[in-house]
């Protein structure tokens, strides 16, 4: 699993928005 992938980045941003 690569954390540098654009998909992961977008997912992280989405999760972060929900968590905040």
Curated annotation (Swiss-Prot):
Keywords: Disulfide bond, Lectin. This is N-acetyl-D-galactosamine-binding lectin subunit B. GO terms for molecular function: carbohydrate binding. Disulfide-linked heterodimer of A and B chains. It comes from Iris hollandica. Gal / GalNAc-specific lectin. Agglutinates both native and trypsin-treated rabbit erythrocytes but not human erythrocytes irrespective of blood group type. The lineage of its organism: Eukaryota, Viridiplantae, Streptophyta, Embryophyta, Tracheophyta.
